[in-house]
Each structure stands twice: as structure tokens, then as C-alpha cells.
């Protein structure tokens, strides 16, 4: 089983929409029973030869390669627009040979996992943010999100990294920026959707999994379990949940994660901080762009080119502000 399959059947708390969970289950456990584990047989991808793909994958994860391919396609679009044709959008965050005012491209696509080679990784994003922060040629972070959410674990550490960034962050999402996706995206100094029909929100915490034991029993597969005399509480909370008694699991596990989630989005979005606890937006509701703007979840809609151009402006303002600080310090 790959990392995403293991996560989905683990019973771990997830920041994800119901539809996102179903989509993920169908993706990694397809109804035809054919699960493709090995992606290395791709001959040519968007102009990359097999040798180039192999060389890239020696130092990068598969997800980073997918991001690199996506970035190359975005660059082609930017090159056709006068306002963005000279912009340097990069995923090589350590490269100090980049032009001044380069923009770091961070892609948050699909299910959020903490640590994965095939899928988006919260740990990898944290490392990428730190690398881009340390590179003087990079002036702004561009978060490109299309995610229904995912794994809750490690998001608190990723949030710390995002909050510690000195360089501005622009969040740009398309289709959906939900649950764990919004946990990440809310750290943008500005947040934009691609269209009026993009989904955003689903701020909340849930756990969802399938109980296969009755099915296994029909196949004659019986689960046997024994606990030491003084280990009566071992896995009890989870077992109670599986048998329909969810009170302790909700109180001890889901509720604390949810408090953390709500505190984070309220600290990043001032309009959300002013809302009462029982506001629908803080109880897991999801919204299209126009209503999301009214609620303060997002700041409007932009084309990709407009969002990139604004990121360039934010980066330039950051550089100018730093130059002014340096000049003042030199005078003092």
C-alpha cells in the first residue's frame, strides 16, 4: 500500500471534505481493482525525455516532478502576457543565480499528507518555504492551491513556518481550497480564487474510515485480540468509536484539533476573528467566491496572470522596504 492508502484506512483525524475523502478513496482503491503503484514507466512528459525524468527523480520526489511539469506549463501562459512575460517563477528555491525579485512557486495539489513521495507533503512545503526565505533572489511566495484537505498531523508545524516567513505570501486557489487546504492557504497576505465558482472553507475537523470487519467475517476471516491485564485502555477510544461510541474520541482528539484550526484561521483573517463561534463558516460550511469575499475567507478573484503580477508587486515592495530599513540603520 502507498502512503495515501495507508492514511485513508488509518482512522487518523483528517482536515478534509466528505467529497474529497470519497474522491481519494476511489482514486487509491478503484472499483476495477487495478491500482497503479509504479509511475516510472512514463516515456515522455510535457517535453521531458525519459532520461530527463530519471535524472530529476534522483534528487526530487515524484510530487516535485509533477509540480515542475505544472510550473513549465504555467510559464508558457505567463510568457504570452506582456505584464508577466519577464517574471521568474521558480521551484528551485536554493538557486542563488536566479534574477532579482524571483517568485517562489509552491503547489498544494490534491490530498494533504504530512510526509509523502507521491503526494503533496506538509513537511516538504515547510522545507521549501525555509529554502526560499534564505534565498536573497526570491522576494515573494506564491501558494497555488487546489485541495479538498487531508491529514491534520504536522499542520501546526507548517503553520509556524508560514507565520515565520518574512517575505510576503500570496495564495491563489482554483476549484477548491478546503479544510487542510485552507489551513495552509489562510496564511497568505492576500488570497484570491480563480473563478466565482471555486469552493473555499470547510473549516473543521473530522475522522472518517470504513469498518471492514463484518465483510471479513463473511469471508471467514475473524479478528483475534488480547490485551495485558493492565492494558485495558489500550486502543479503547478508537475501539469505542468503531462501535458507535464516539464521545471520548470527539472530546479528546477531534475537538482539540478543531480549536487549534479555528485559532489559526482567526489569527490570519481578521473578519473571521470577529465572528461568533456558531457562525456557519466556523462550523465547516463551504462557500463559492462571492460569499467567501463577504465573509472574509478570500479577497476576490484573479486570473493566474493577475495573481502572479500582484505577487511581483508584493515582492518589489518587500525589497524596497528592506532597502529603506538598511538605509535607516546605516544612518543611525
Give the label of every model feature segment.
Residues 1-197, 203-332:
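N-terminal organellar transit peptides
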Amino acid at each position: 500500500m502507498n502512503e495515501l492508502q495507508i492514511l485513508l484506512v488509518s482512522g487518523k483525524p483528517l482536515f478534509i471534505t466528505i467529497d474529497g475523502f470519497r474522491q481519494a478513496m476511489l482514486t487509491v482503491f478503484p472499483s476495477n481493482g487495478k491500482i497503479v503503484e509504479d509511475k516510472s514507466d512514463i516515456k515522455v512528459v510535457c517535453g521531458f525525455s525519459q532520461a530527463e525524468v530519471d535524472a530529476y527523480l534522483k534528487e526530487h520526489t515524484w510530487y516535485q516532478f509533477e509540480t515542475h511539469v505544472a510550473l513549465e506549463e504555467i510559464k508558457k501562459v505567463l510568457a504570452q502576457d506582456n505584464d508577466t512575460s519577464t517574471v521568474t517563477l521558480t521551484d528551485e528555491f536554493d538557486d542563488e543565480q536566479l534574477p532579482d525579485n524571483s517568485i517562489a512557486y509552491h503547489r498544494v495539489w490534491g490530498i494533504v499528507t504530512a510526509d509523502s513521495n507521491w503526494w503533496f507533503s506538509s513537511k516538504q512545503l515547510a522545507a521549501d518555504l525555509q529554502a526560499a526565505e534564505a534565498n536573497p533572489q526570491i522576494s515573494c511566495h506564491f501558494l497555488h492551491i487546489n485541495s479538498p484537505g487531508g491529514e491534520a498531523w504536522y499542520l501546526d508545524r507548517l503553520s509556524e513556518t508560514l507565520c515565520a516567513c518574512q517575505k510576503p505570501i500570496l495564495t491563489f486557489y482554483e476549484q477548491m481550497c478546503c479544510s487542510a487546504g485552507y489551513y495552509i492557504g489562510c496564511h497568505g497576505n492576500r488570497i484570491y480564487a480563480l473563478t466565482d465558482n471555486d469552493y473555499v472553507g470547510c473549516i473543521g475537523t473530522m475522522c472518517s474510515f470504513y469498518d471492514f470487519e463484518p465483510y471479513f467475517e463473511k469471508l471467514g476471516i475473524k479478528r483475534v485480540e488480547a490485551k495485558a491485564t493492565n492494558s485495558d485502555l489500550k486502543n479503547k477510544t478508537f475501539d469505542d468509536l468503531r462501535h458507535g461510541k464516539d464521545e471520548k474520541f470527539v472530546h479528546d482528539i477531534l475537538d482539540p484539533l478543531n480549536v487549534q484550526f479555528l485559532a489559526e484561521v482567526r489569527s490570519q483573517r481578521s473578519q473571521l476573528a470577529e465572528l461568533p463561534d456558531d457562525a456557519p463558516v466556523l462550523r465547516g460550511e463551504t462557500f463559492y467566491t462571492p460569499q467567501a469575499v463577504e465573509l472574509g475567507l478570500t479577497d476576490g478573484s484573479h486570473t493566474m496572470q493577475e495573481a502572479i503580477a500582484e505577487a511581483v508587486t508584493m515582492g518589489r515592495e518587500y525589497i524596497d522596504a528592506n532597502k529603506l530599513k538598511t538605509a535607516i540603520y546605516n544612518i543611525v
